Regions:
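NAD(P)-dependent Rossmann-like dehydrogenase/reductase catalytic/cofactor-binding core
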Residues: 53, 57-64, 68, 89-99, ...
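Internal alpha-helical scaffold of NAD(P)-dependent oxidoreductase catalytic cores
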Residues: 10-58, 62-97
């Protein structure tokens, strides 16, 4: 999180650049004593990780907000990582990219901490059992919460774009799709776990 970097706490991140020479030079120049950058020339996978982890963080927050437990969150994060890798590969990236800082690392951070705007919104949605529109309408009536209601939550916009990507690349992303259904009020939160758990059996991957 940016606040921790500003305070000099240790951190690491991926720097995506197709030009390896330029990427290595930029990583070396931009790294700080307490913050290390690792060059990654696989730009597609880094981009997919950066976008989709926000959607999975929303889902993780909803899971905890609704009281579904730590086991459910761990399963969701793990299967969410699989969806990230699946989409990256379909778009021409590499699955292994998502095992690094821009995938697993960023996902663990964003999907478990209340410093994350996406996770915080998920918690609120899970506790309220409402769609995004319903929660926003209720929140902005409280002047003390109006500022937080206007926060930019990247996962909301990303979730809305995923249906098109799934169709274009022929990829199934059941968790990400469920988040969009929840945000738009197409399905109640109480029904989502049952919907996901009753999907046709398949091998892990």
């Amino acid at each position: 999180f940016a606040a921790e970097v500003v305070h000099g706490l240790p951190a690491a991140a991926a720097l995506a650049c197709a030009d390896a020479t330029l990427g290595m030079a930029a990583g070396e120049r931009l790294s700080l004593p307490s913050s290390r950058l690792y060059h990654n020339s696989e730009v597609v996978g880094v981009q997919v990780g950066g976008a989709l982890k926000n959607v999975i963080a929303l889902a993780a927050g909803m899971t905890m907000g609704h009281g579904l437990g730590e086991n459910a969150r761990a399963a969701l994060i793990t299967r969410g990582l699989a969806e990230m890798a699946r989409l990256a590969e379909a778009m021409g990236g590499q699955r292994t990219t998502l095992m690094g800082l821009s995938g697993l690392g960023d996902l663990l951070l964003t999907a478990t901490s209340e410093q994350s705007r996406n996770y915080r919104l998920g918690l609120k949605l899970g506790r309220a059992g409402q769609s995004l529109a319903e929660l926003t309408a209720a929140t902005v009536t409280d002047v003390s919460n109006a500022a937080s209601a206007q926060e930019t939550v990247e996962g909301v916009g990303s979730a809305a774009l995923l249906a098109d990507l799934c169709q274009r690349y022929g990829v199934e992303l059941p968790l990400a799709g469920a988040v969009q259904q929840l945000l738009t009020g197409q399905i109640p939160l109480a029904a989502v776990a049952q919907q996901l758990l009753t999907r046709p059996y398949r091998a892990e991957g």
